[in-house]
Amino acid sequence: MAFLTDRSLATGVTLQDLIHIVITGDTSQGNPDGSSYKATIGQVADAVSLYEIGSGVDSTQRKDVNLYSCGNCSVVSGGFNNTAMDCYSTIVGGSGNTASGYNSFIGGGLLNMTIRSGSTISGGYCNLNRGYDSFIGGGYCNWITSSNHSSIGGGCLNLLGNSANSVISGGKSNTMILGNQSFIGGGTGNTQTSSVFSFIGGGSDNKIRLLDYATISGGYNNKIDGEGCYATISGGYNNTINGDISFIGGGGCNYVDTMSTITGGKNNTTMCCYSFIGGGSGNTIIESYSTIVGGCSNTTLSACYSFIGGGCRNSINNDYSMIGGGTRNVAYGDGSFIGGGLQNTLNGATSIIVGGSNNKTTGNYSIVSGGRNNTISNNIYSTISGGYSNTITSDCSGILGGDNNYLCNTNSFIIGKSINTNRDNTTFINNLTITQLPTYVDNSAALGGGLNVGDVYRTSTGDLKIVY
């Protein structure tokens, strides 16, 4: 058996110096203890090294595994069939990867490609990075095209195109085109187009287009579209904003045109500026500065500065009006109020129907407090307090209650039932009971006793008298 001499390494040794090598187990020279050979130190180093110089200047590549470092100062340290084509590019491992961008990096994976300077792909499959100083973390079939300083964290089939300083964190089939300084967190099929400083948190099939500083937090098939900025959809499904400075909190199938808010609910619509729908379903605002708090199928049509609190199928058709609630109430007059009830109709300006059912007023500055089928027609300053089927057709008149009364004289009043008036300045009563009247002998005694002209007193014989 051959033994090696224990000696220190001589100084000044170079790769061209010859050395004596004994390979134990090699009996080709007839010696059972091994064979001896002469070689330079460089020849021995090349024989045992895993790496070799690539075709690029000062480049390095792993030997014998179809790796190519073509760029100057490039490195391919492992994997199979990888190519570093540009200067200072690096591929650590994987298979079929190509680093053709200056100072670009591929960590591993399969069939990944970097094209622009400073681009990075950490791993994954079939990813393409064509953005300067951009990053793809992994996943498969994620593409960055002409999007500088941007990132795709992972997921699959995500696309960043012409969107500088933007991020898609992950998810599937998310797309950002012309969306500088924007963000998609994840989800599926979300899209941002021609909108800067915008945000989609997640969800599915959400879209932002042509509107800057827009936000969709999540949900399904929500859409922000139109020119402008500062619109937000927090969640829900099939919600749409078509203008700027607007908000939808959630719900489904809600629509905001511009500068308005829908908090939630379903199938609610605002077609104007500065309006609000709190919730409910099927509510619609057509004119500006109006509010519907909730309910169903309530509508403000040609009505600015109007309010519907709730109820169902209530409608306001003129400005500065309010319906508190109820069902099928309609206000046509400016500055009018319906508190609630059923099928009340108000055509007069600055008039009020507090409640009841089927009450109507076409008079201005008039009031129907309640009851049923009561009507104030084409007059002003009149009042029906309640009752059933009462009608006023004159000014400055009133019906306290009762039923089937008809008042057609000015400054007249009805207290009772089935009364028809026939003169002005008169109060009409079916029956009148007066109790605890003072008793006096005559008119002089009544005046002396403190009564005033027009007061009523009783004589000792039971007669009623009026002081004169």
Where are these regions (language model features)?
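Glycine-rich, low-complexity segments
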Residues: 1-5, 34-75, 425-453, 459-468
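A general structural signal for short secondary-structure junctions and capping/turn motifs
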Residues: 9-12, 417-420, 456
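Glycine-centered loop/turn motifs
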Residues: 11-12, 16, 425, 454
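Short, surface-exposed beta-strand/loop "edge" segments at domain boundaries and coil↔beta transitions
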Residues: 24-33, 436
